[in-house]
């Protein structure tokens, strides 16, 4: 059975601000199934931002598990991410989930993968999904050459990715923490 896939999620951190945004396109093969999906959310009483890319059902399953880990570890982002990655890597059922997450709070941004990786991205920029490379490149250039706020960098980066990646549209959801 073919999976739903394709998206762009990007996070930018500057000073005491962090923004996380994503597009709204859900694709099944070469068909756009939905253009307004919400793949970025504020969770844990608005203290943590999370964005996901990959197979939609898998991503929602991981999002639920990550929220449970945050509750268990009283909002400690790193411990929650490592605990989720460990389960994801070792659990037989979870091991087959095809998705990635970017999570962020006031102090850190992390990328969580199904390989058991918890990555702290360099330069305060993280991006995943089919248009992630485009968005990350655009965000890096904007961060190095402008004084734009993280939200504006995320929006412009997503717009560029949406113009280049066929699996990314320009219907964005952007969340911020200050």
UniProtKB/Swiss-Prot annotation:
Keywords: Allosteric enzyme, Cytoplasm, Hydrolase, Metal-binding, Protease, Sodium, Threonine protease. The keyword Hydrolase applies. Allosterically activated by HslU binding. GO terms for biological process: proteolysis involved in protein catabolic process. It is an enzyme of class 3 (hydrolase). The keyword Phosphoprotein does not apply. The active site is at 7. CDD domains: protease_HslV (cd01913). GO terms for molecular function: metal ion binding; threonine-type endopeptidase activity. It catalyses: ATP-dependent cleavage of peptide bonds with broad specificity. Its EC number is 3.4.25.2. Na(+) binds at residues 162, 165, 168. GO terms for cellular component: HslUV protease complex; proteasome core complex. It comes from the Bacteria. It is found in: Cytoplasm. Signal peptide: none annotated. A double ring-shaped homohexamer of HslV is capped on each side by a ring-shaped HslU homohexamer. The assembly of the HslU/HslV complex is dependent on binding of ATP. Belongs to the peptidase T1B family. HslV subfamily. Protease subunit of a proteasome-like degradation complex believed to be a general protein degrading machinery. HAMAP family: HslV. This is ATP-dependent protease subunit HslV. The gene is hslV.
